[in-house]
Amino acid sequence: MNILQNLKESDPVISNFIKSEKNRQETHLELIASENFASIAVMEAQGSVLTNKYAEGLPQKRYYGGCEFVDQIEELAIQRAKKLFNANWANVQPHSGAQANAAVFLSLLKPGDTIMGMDLSHGGHLTHGSPVNMSGKWFNAVHYGVNKETSELNFDEIREIALETKPKLIICGYSAYPRTIDFESFRNIADEVGAFLMADIAHIAGLVASKLHPNPIPYCDVVTTTTHKTLRGPRGGLILCKDAEFGKKFDKSVFPGTQGGPLEHIIAAKAVAFGEALQPDFVNYSQQVIKNAKVLASTLINRGIDIVSGGTDNHIVLLDLRSINMTGKIADLLVSEVNITANKNTVPFDPESPFVTSGLRLGTAALTTRGFNENAFAEVGEIIADRLLNPDDSLIESQCKERVLTLCNRFPLYESKLEASIK
């Protein structure tokens, strides 16, 4: 069954859009830190007949008949997730990381309770108490940030804020923090003020699974994550706990609390991705992700572009463009013109608005999936520096784009199987 061929015949307009997107991915350097390239096996699971099945409830406790096979798939996804993160409980049904976080809030909090997370402009996330998100509208959100000198977590300040505000829930885990997170220190603070501790490891889940970043499971009451990004699976969410009995309370907050029927085709794809992440090759991949990020950071620093915190411990490289008198909005446009995809991002203590910003966030997960090594990322760093430091030079712009296309041809995105099915 060639689904894409059927799509071409049934809806050539959508088929052509998909082909165009595939071409864009092949001919651009994907440096958005939250993106990656799922395997063909993961994509096949997503596009399977499982999309036809309703399965409200949990395995063996469904509200619909005919769930014997999706039960087995979901149970396998749960088993693999628990093994991957050394957890005793898992729920694989959340449609996204935001949905996973919402389910946790529903279980542990009441409207008006105080939650404490990192300020969005310092590297936090919308769902950690931003005033534009339900987490900031329904709860009393207080925020901590990073040290102004080091751009790293300041646990003395975090403790002071916690002691003063007495949050019901403390959130650690970020969207633009390039350093290792000390979960044990957060646990100590949470215990001191009597708070629940939640880790949102959406960005670093693959590194945690590979044991290249400390695991929050032993220290946190609950852990949430997405299943794409460094984990390289389908777009979706996941909730994990060390305490199986405590974890059961989140089952009801996922369904019927915040969702209806689970997406069993996505859960199958999650199971495939978890299986891939349990293989030794995935550890090698994760190691390369970090090596590549360090090379990218050092290359840019050597060209006179500041990096927030002076480097990175994970896949994220956050440029502070105030060092070259440029905004993130302009930098994002400049690199996009030479087929590099990134995103403007606030930096700690940013004087610019979130629509302009002083930063550019880069990530190495996607290109590492394509096979990029340290030498390739050194070239990526040089291309970015050449473009940003010469914004008005059309010749350098043209040369940068040629160098990007050379790298794209050197590291093709997918093997011939996908190529043949889309043509």
Curated annotation (Swiss-Prot):
The modification N6-(pyridoxal phosphate)lysine is found at K229. Keywords: Amino-acid biosynthesis, Cytoplasm, One-carbon metabolism, Pyridoxal phosphate, Transferase. It is found in: Cytoplasm. (6S)-5,6,7,8-tetrahydrofolate binds at L120, G124, H125, L126, S353, P354, F355. Pfam families: SHMT (PF00464). GO terms for cellular component: cytosol. Coiled coil: none annotated. Pathway: One-carbon metabolism; tetrahydrofolate interconversion; Amino-acid biosynthesis; glycine biosynthesis; glycine from L-serine: step 1/1. One of its GO terms (molecular function) is glycine hydroxymethyltransferase activity. GO terms for biological process: glycine biosynthetic process from serine; tetrahydrofolate interconversion. The record marks H228 as: Plays an important role in substrate specificity. Belongs to the SHMT family. Catalyzes the reversible interconversion of serine and glycine with tetrahydrofolate (THF) serving as the one-carbon carrier. This reaction serves as the major source of one-carbon groups required for the biosynthesis of purines, thymidylate, methionine, and other important biomolecules. Also exhibits THF-independent aldolase activity toward beta-hydroxyamino acids, producing glycine and aldehydes, via a retro-aldol mechanism. This is Serine hydroxymethyltransferase. The gene is glyA.
